[in-house]
Structures are given as structure tokens and as C-alpha cells.
Amino acid sequence: MVSERTEEEQIEAFKNWWAENGLKTILGIFLIFGGYVGWQSYESKVASESQAASDIWQTIITTMNEAPDGNLSQENIVSIHKNGDKLKNEYGSTSYAHFAAAMKAKLAVEANNIELAVQELNWVLDNGADNAFVPIITLRLAKLEASRKNYEEALKILENADPGTLKSSFEETKGDLYMVLERTDEAYTAYNSAILFNKSSDQLLN
């Protein structure tokens, strides 16, 4: 029930936070525990790795943008998966790797390879994705599990995660799962919570 704009704002907020604070936070921690010489060496290394990861991510974006009408060729898809795997394997702690894995999951869903999509989203959650990005990935993972009729697993995923600003979407999805499982009372409770959280979000936006 929460608007699509909410997810877009979550992603944009994460991108902005990383651009403004992510690298400074990492380098700041090192400065506390390291000396000036170590700082210079580490600063150079991190900057180099960040730029390399950024370049690979830009290649992925360029490949997608150049596809006519958004229709990716098989060559495009192979290229995106290849560069995504490179980011995951060589720069797995960066936001670029997390976004690449999410992109790979999207392509896997479009290819009806739900197992691969689930693996990619789990990789994001297991490899230090920022808290701002986690609720989006968690919700998508739960819906994928539901799509292959793993309803109890989908519920478990949602119940064990912090929904962040996606509380309404989490509760609505829980309601859908409870209905499939014929747990009607719990479904109505979840739907009511979704409505309340959605109204609360609307008030914050106004």
C-alpha cells in the first residue's frame, strides 16, 4: 500500500548517504586507530578501489541505458552478470556490489530463474548492505519466496527484519501471506496495521 515513491526515496537516500558519508566514515575509523603514514596508504587504497568499483558499476548502467527501449540482448545480459560478479568478488563490501547483486536478481526474475534471484538477494543481506537498503531487499526476497510457495519462509523473513520506512508494505505482504495460509484473523490484523502505517506515512509527507 505504500507508494512506489517510498522505495525510490529509500534508494536515493542510501545513494546520497554513501556519496556524502560512506567513505569518510570508513576513513575516519582508520584514522582513530592508525598513524598518519598508514592513513595515507589506506586513503589511497580505498580511493582506488572505490573508483574501480564505480567504473564497473558505470559500465553496467551504460549497458542498460544503451539497450533500445530497455530491451536487453543476451549479450547485454551476459555483460551485466559478468560485471556484477566482478563487483561482488573484488569489491564485495561496496555499495556498488550490493546494487549489482540486486540488478542481477532482477534479471534472474525476468529470466524466470527465481533460485538465482533468491541467492543474489541473500548475498546482499549477508554482505553488509546499508540499513537504508536492507528493507527493500528483504521485502523483495520475501515476495520471491512467496512466489515459489514458501509462505512460512517468507513470513519468517519479514518478521525477523526491520522494515524501516516500509512498515506498511511489510504488513500488507504479511496479510497476503496469512490469507494464503488461511490465518484470517492475523491477516486482518496485518492489513489494519498496513493502513495505519500508510496513513502515518502520508502525514509525514504532507
Predicted segments, located by residue:
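N-terminal positive-inside, membrane-proximal cytosolic segments immediately preceding the first
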Residues: 1-31
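Structural signature of alpha-solenoid helical repeat junctions
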Residues: 51-52, 56, 76-79, 92, ...
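Short extracytoplasmic
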Residues: 58-90
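Alpha-helical adaptor scaffolds
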Residues: 77, 97-169
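Alpha-helical junction/boundary sensor with strong preference for TPR arrays
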Residues: 84, 91, 127-128, 164-165, ...
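Extracytoplasmic/periplasmic C-terminal soluble domains
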Residues: 152-206
